[in-house]
Amino acid sequence: MSLDIAKYPTLALAENPEELRMLPKESLPKLCDELRQYLLASVSRSSGHFASGLGVVELTVALHYVYNTPFDSLVWDVGHQAYPHKILTGRREQIGTIRQKDGLHPFPWRGESEYDVLSVGHSSTSISAGLGMAVAAEREGKGRRTVCVIGDGAITAGMAFEAMNHAGDIHSDMLVILNDNEMSISENVGGLNNHLAQLLSGKLYTSLREGGKKAFSGLPPIKDLLKRTEEHLKGMVVPSTLFEELGFNYIGPVDGHDVQALTQTLKNMRSLKGPQLLHIMTKKGKGYAPAEKDPIGWHAVPKFDPASGTLPKSQGNIPTYSKIFGEWLCETAAKDSQLMAVTPAMREGSGMVRFSREYPQQYFDVAIAEQHAVTFAAGLAIGGYKPIVAIYSTFLQRAYDQLIHDVAIQNLPVLFAIDRGGLVGADGQTHQGAFDLSFMRCIPNMAIMTPSDENECRQMLHTGYHHNGPAAVRYPRGNGTGAVLEPLAIMPIGKGIVRREGEKVAILCFGTLLAQAQIVADNLNATLVDMRFVKPLDEELVLELAASHEVLVTVEENAIMGGAGSGVNELLMAKRQLVSVLNLGLPDHFVPQGEQDEMRAEFGLDAAGIQSQIEAWLE
């Protein structure tokens, strides 16, 4: 897909930042307008992250205009907002391939461009990495500058504050830009504050500030008086800030959509010494009314018609696994006031919107704080409640120590509803749920369940909720299979079920690839087993299958290394059972973006791939 660049004459002159910096400053507002329209036209045709990019158009233009990228390091946190950055850094013609197999990466990616200095995808990493780059730049001694852009959501994470605390302590030269899009631009974030920001970042104020500190450094009472006077003066017109206490020079808030003022403020700040924080106010979805009105709904979008202002409705009546979880949550909470649901800022994605509205006293969104979420749940369990942590597989990685130290060691009854297990599709390497079975399986006391359809998912959530110890139910992104939902009942822990009796080959399936495995079992007259539990493994059943079949095939949408199949291998070795075993799953490399079905086919995890691998093994 290629757009007619002739419709965007100013943008056509800015193929890369070098060309951008040659434009007169007066042309920047026009460039921003065209960039925003280009982004709208592109994403509406290709799908992708949308509202975040619209909100940082002016900031992106100003940063590349003022800073000498890629010599200067520009670090984007998370990266949802980096589409304008990609368009301005030589990837304009490829932006229509973003998030597609073999296309542009959905986030900044080091292997894709020299302008992407940090590969990202998870939140709150930018300041830590940026500080490391700033220290390296200081030792290099060539005047390289470091800028980190972080949102008001991502900055709530502990890692961001840990990094700021360290930056303030070692006083390295770096700029952190806080992109605050929680509210629309208010009147006090207008001319006065823009003028104040330029004044506070200007050379005269800075030299007086630093010179005065040096001159009176030996006289504590006078130094303290100056500091109090400075804070009082700033406090009249800008928010009081935690950032100054962390050692940052705070400037702002300023209008993040005034590209001229933003450019001047950044020019003033470029030469400042020590850690600086610029607080800008932006509107997520800026320039496209439907996205401004509903920035969450327009955060990541399918292909749509810009003229209609609406997103296409999903087809079919089969619910997603996230919806199945949310409905089960409400059903259970209606009967049990001890239920407490915890999520680290993933209410919409985890299917918890209805629950949060109907049971607000039992719902906790702890923000982007996965470590806190898990230990908070441990505390709830100690207090006699029944906590459920709803979390994506990829984000549970961030709370691994808490899972072990605060939940499993104490054998606390915390249920983990792990969404996005396995291949997730367009978000690529940083978001694949490829490792959870591997990193949980080695933890004592854990019960790990892998449903094969939405009915089993409900039954396993019910079972895990009533289990007296830590339990995890791991389910994929996307729709169920259309299975009939049965009344809830507790399942026997650690027991699989034989779905089909066959000969010679037994296929042991962990999770929702069962439907694909069923086709293969029918074609090969193989035994098919829905294993259900990764831990505790149904050892009795596995040993029976090993004794009655020539080949065992394990199938899972998880890394082969350390996964469910490895558990089968370990059991057979421990019992000295000599039987041929083929482990099928995800390979030992990070899986890039692509549609889920595309990637399953590539890794031989669709029906045709499973069958061909088994047939090759039997030769």
Swiss-Prot record:
Q: What parts of the sequence cross the membrane?
A: none
Q: Entry's SUPFAM superfamilies?
A: Thiamin diphosphate-binding fold (THDP-binding), TK C-terminal domain-like
What catalytic activity is recorded?
Answer: D-glyceraldehyde 3-phosphate + pyruvate + H(+) = 1-deoxy-D-xylulose 5-phosphate + CO2
Quaternary structure, from the entry: Homodimer.
**GO cellular component assignments:** cytosol
Q: Please state the Enzyme Commission number of this protein.
A: 2.2.1.7
Its name, as the record gives it, is: 1-deoxy-D-xylulose-5-phosphate synthase
Listed cofactors:
Mg(2+); thiamine diphosphate
Q: Which HAMAP family match?
A: DXP_synth
Annotated NCBIfam families: dxs, PRK05444.2-2
- In Pfam terms, one family for this protein is Transket_pyr
Please state which protein family the record places this protein in.
Belongs to the transketolase family. DXPS subfamily.
